[in-house]
A protein has these predicted regions:
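Short hydrophobic/aromatic-rich beta-strand segments that constitute the beta-sheet cores
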Residues: 14, 32, 66-68
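Ligand-binding loop in jelly-roll beta-barrel domains
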Residues: 44, 52-75
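Short, conserved beta-strand element in jelly-roll/cupin
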Residues: 17-32
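Short alpha-helix capping/helix-loop boundary micro-motifs
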Residues: 33-37
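Histidine-centered metal-chelating micro-motifs
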Residues: 12, 38, 47-48, 52-57
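Short beta-strand segments
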Residues: 3, 38-40
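Conserved short histidine dyad/triad with adjacent acidic residue
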Residues: 1-17, 51-53, 74-75
């Protein structure tokens, strides 16, 4: 799956399950904190991958717009 996603500031719980998600931020700022880990800040122009099994907090600091690609490996 691919798409464009946008969100206003706020906090949500993120649970990836068995899916990889590639993200490229077109605008905005997010802070992603894995459970038991340290927060990482991503800004417009940054790209990152959320791996299967990720559990943590996604905080939209500034309204964010991203393109994404999700891939679920075969069982």
């Amino acid at each position: 799956h691919t798409g464009v996603w946008e969100a206003t500031p706020g906090v949500t719980r993120s649970i990836k399950g068995d899916t990889f998600e590639f993200c490229h931020l077109l605008s905005g700022v997010v802070e992603i904190t894995p459970d038991g880990g340290s927060p990482v800040i991503y800004k417009a122009g940054d790209s990152f991958v959320m791996k299967p099994g990720f559990v943590g907090v996604w905080k939209t600091v500034e309204t964010v717009r991203k393109i994404y690609v999700t891939v679920t490996p075969p069982a």
